[in-house]
Amino acid sequence: MTTVDGDTIYEYDPLDRLIKTTTPDGESTSMTYDGVGNITSSTDANGNTTQYKYDGVGNVVETIDALGTSAFFEYDSMGNLVKTRLHRVDTQDNVDEWEVTLYEFDGRGLTTKQVDALGNVTTYAYDGNGNLVSKTDPDGYTTEYTYNALDLVTKINYNDAKEVSYRYNKTGDLISMTNWLGTTTFELDLLHQL
Protein backbone atom coordinates (compact mmCIF):
# COMPACT_ATOMS: atom_id res chain seq x y z
CA MET A 1 0.00 0.00 0.00
CA THR A 2 1.26 3.48 -0.83
CA THR A 3 -0.03 6.75 0.61
CA VAL A 4 0.92 10.33 -0.15
CA ASP A 5 1.01 13.08 2.48
CA GLY A 6 1.65 16.32 0.65
CA ASP A 7 4.49 15.30 -1.60
CA THR A 8 6.00 12.67 0.71
CA ILE A 9 5.29 9.08 -0.31
CA TYR A 10 4.87 6.37 2.35
CA GLU A 11 5.01 2.70 1.37
CA TYR A 12 3.72 -0.10 3.61
CA ASP A 13 4.05 -3.88 3.57
CA PRO A 14 1.01 -6.23 3.64
CA LEU A 15 1.03 -6.04 7.47
CA ASP A 16 0.65 -2.23 7.30
CA ARG A 17 4.22 -1.55 8.50
CA LEU A 18 6.05 1.43 7.04
CA ILE A 19 8.82 0.13 4.76
CA LYS A 20 9.82 3.19 2.73
CA THR A 21 9.49 6.96 2.84
CA THR A 22 10.34 9.14 -0.15
CA THR A 23 10.55 12.92 0.27
CA PRO A 24 9.66 15.46 -2.43
CA ASP A 25 13.35 15.81 -3.35
CA GLY A 26 13.56 12.05 -4.02
CA GLU A 27 15.46 11.02 -0.89
CA SER A 28 14.33 7.68 0.51
CA THR A 29 14.60 5.88 3.81
CA SER A 30 13.62 2.25 4.26
CA MET A 31 13.06 -0.31 7.01
CA THR A 32 12.87 -4.09 7.36
CA TYR A 33 11.12 -6.06 10.10
CA ASP A 34 11.34 -9.42 11.83
CA GLY A 35 8.43 -11.82 12.29
CA VAL A 36 7.11 -10.05 15.39
CA GLY A 37 7.25 -6.54 13.95
CA ASN A 38 10.57 -5.27 15.32
CA ILE A 39 12.60 -3.11 12.96
CA THR A 40 15.69 -5.15 12.01
CA SER A 41 17.33 -2.55 9.77
CA SER A 42 16.88 1.02 8.65
CA THR A 43 18.61 2.65 5.71
CA ASP A 44 18.89 6.42 5.45
CA ALA A 45 18.86 8.58 2.32
CA ASN A 46 22.65 8.22 1.98
CA GLY A 47 22.48 4.43 1.93
CA ASN A 48 23.78 4.01 5.49
CA THR A 49 22.19 1.00 7.15
CA THR A 50 21.73 0.46 10.88
CA GLN A 51 20.86 -3.03 12.15
CA TYR A 52 18.85 -3.75 15.31
CA LYS A 53 18.78 -6.81 17.58
CA TYR A 54 16.22 -7.50 20.33
CA ASP A 55 15.78 -9.56 23.47
CA GLY A 56 12.81 -11.85 24.09
CA VAL A 57 10.58 -9.03 25.33
CA GLY A 58 11.27 -6.62 22.47
CA ASN A 59 13.95 -4.38 23.99
CA VAL A 60 16.68 -3.27 21.60
CA VAL A 61 19.86 -4.94 22.89
CA GLU A 62 22.26 -4.05 20.07
CA THR A 63 22.55 -1.67 17.15
CA ILE A 64 25.26 -1.73 14.51
CA ASP A 65 25.67 1.32 12.31
CA ALA A 66 27.14 1.63 8.83
CA LEU A 67 30.62 2.39 10.27
CA GLY A 68 30.65 -0.80 12.33
CA THR A 69 30.04 0.93 15.65
CA SER A 70 27.98 -1.29 17.93
CA ALA A 71 25.86 -0.07 20.80
CA PHE A 72 24.79 -2.57 23.45
CA PHE A 73 21.87 -1.91 25.80
CA GLU A 74 21.13 -3.58 29.14
CA TYR A 75 17.82 -3.39 31.01
CA ASP A 76 16.62 -4.10 34.53
CA SER A 77 13.69 -6.41 35.33
CA MET A 78 11.26 -3.50 34.86
CA GLY A 79 12.51 -2.81 31.33
CA ASN A 80 14.44 0.34 32.27
CA LEU A 81 17.63 0.97 30.33
CA VAL A 82 20.44 0.69 32.91
CA LYS A 83 23.59 0.57 30.79
CA THR A 84 24.82 1.38 27.30
CA ARG A 85 28.18 0.41 25.83
CA LEU A 86 29.57 1.63 22.54
CA HIS A 87 32.13 -0.45 20.65
CA ARG A 88 33.93 0.45 17.48
CA VAL A 89 35.61 -2.07 15.17
CA ASP A 90 38.68 -0.79 13.31
CA THR A 91 39.93 -1.93 9.90
CA GLN A 92 41.92 -4.78 11.54
CA ASP A 93 38.77 -6.07 13.30
CA ASN A 94 40.00 -4.84 16.69
CA VAL A 95 37.19 -3.91 19.07
CA ASP A 96 37.56 -0.75 21.10
CA GLU A 97 35.10 -0.21 23.96
CA TRP A 98 35.06 3.53 24.20
CA GLU A 99 31.99 4.59 26.08
CA VAL A 100 29.85 3.17 28.85
CA THR A 101 26.88 5.00 30.35
CA LEU A 102 25.09 3.77 33.48
CA TYR A 103 21.58 4.73 34.58
CA GLU A 104 19.73 4.49 37.90
CA PHE A 105 15.96 4.70 38.38
CA ASP A 106 13.44 5.27 41.14
CA GLY A 107 10.47 3.01 41.86
CA ARG A 108 8.43 4.76 39.16
CA GLY A 109 10.98 4.00 36.45
CA LEU A 110 12.21 7.60 36.24
CA THR A 111 15.92 8.17 35.64
CA THR A 112 17.53 9.55 38.81
CA LYS A 113 21.21 9.26 37.90
CA GLN A 114 23.35 8.96 34.79
CA VAL A 115 27.08 8.22 34.90
CA ASP A 116 29.07 8.55 31.68
CA ALA A 117 32.28 6.80 30.66
CA LEU A 118 34.43 9.42 32.40
CA GLY A 119 32.55 9.08 35.68
CA ASN A 120 30.64 12.34 35.21
CA VAL A 121 27.37 12.21 37.12
CA THR A 122 24.08 13.87 36.21
CA THR A 123 21.23 13.60 38.73
CA TYR A 124 17.50 14.12 38.28
CA ALA A 125 14.68 14.76 40.80
CA TYR A 126 10.92 14.60 40.23
CA ASP A 127 7.71 15.74 41.90
CA GLY A 128 4.84 13.45 42.89
CA ASN A 129 3.40 13.62 39.37
CA GLY A 130 6.65 12.47 37.77
CA ASN A 131 7.61 15.91 36.46
CA LEU A 132 11.31 16.69 36.36
CA VAL A 133 11.91 19.37 39.02
CA SER A 134 15.70 19.54 38.96
CA LYS A 135 18.65 18.37 36.94
CA THR A 136 22.21 18.72 38.22
CA ASP A 137 24.96 18.29 35.65
CA PRO A 138 28.49 16.96 36.25
CA ASP A 139 29.79 20.50 36.89
CA GLY A 140 27.30 20.98 39.73
CA TYR A 141 25.02 23.33 37.79
CA THR A 142 21.38 22.81 38.70
CA THR A 143 18.40 23.61 36.50
CA GLU A 144 15.06 23.77 38.32
CA TYR A 145 11.58 23.37 36.81
CA THR A 146 8.22 24.58 38.16
CA TYR A 147 4.83 23.30 36.95
CA ASN A 148 1.19 24.37 37.12
CA ALA A 149 -1.80 22.21 38.11
CA LEU A 150 -1.95 20.83 34.54
CA ASP A 151 1.68 19.62 34.84
CA LEU A 152 2.81 22.20 32.28
CA VAL A 153 6.19 23.80 32.93
CA THR A 154 5.75 27.42 34.06
CA LYS A 155 9.31 28.33 34.96
CA ILE A 156 12.84 27.11 34.35
CA ASN A 157 15.61 28.50 36.56
CA TYR A 158 19.13 28.02 35.30
CA ASN A 159 22.20 27.90 37.54
CA ASP A 160 23.48 31.20 36.12
CA ALA A 161 20.37 32.98 37.51
CA LYS A 162 18.73 33.16 34.10
CA GLU A 163 15.07 32.27 34.05
CA VAL A 164 12.48 31.33 31.44
CA SER A 165 8.77 31.51 32.25
CA TYR A 166 5.79 30.20 30.32
CA ARG A 167 2.12 31.25 30.37
CA TYR A 168 -0.79 29.14 29.16
CA ASN A 169 -4.47 29.73 28.47
CA LYS A 170 -7.23 27.76 30.24
CA THR A 171 -6.97 24.87 27.77
CA GLY A 172 -3.22 24.48 28.27
CA ASP A 173 -2.04 26.19 25.09
CA LEU A 174 1.23 28.12 25.40
CA ILE A 175 0.47 31.84 24.96
CA SER A 176 3.75 33.49 25.98
CA MET A 177 7.35 32.80 26.88
CA THR A 178 9.58 35.25 28.73
CA ASN A 179 13.35 34.95 29.03
CA TRP A 180 16.29 37.30 29.65
CA LEU A 181 15.88 38.63 26.09
CA GLY A 182 12.21 39.55 26.42
CA THR A 183 8.73 38.13 25.90
CA THR A 184 7.39 36.22 22.93
CA THR A 185 3.60 36.02 22.57
CA PHE A 186 1.85 33.26 20.64
CA GLU A 187 -1.51 33.80 18.93
CA LEU A 188 -3.69 30.77 18.33
CA ASP A 189 -6.59 30.21 15.96
CA LEU A 190 -9.87 28.50 16.88
CA LEU A 191 -8.21 25.11 16.34
CA HIS A 192 -5.54 25.98 18.95
CA GLN A 193 -2.85 26.24 16.25
CA LEU A 194 -0.23 28.96 15.96
Predicted segments with their positions:
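Beta-strand elements of repeat-based all-beta scaffolds
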Residues: M1-T23, E27-D44, N48-D65, T69-D116, ...
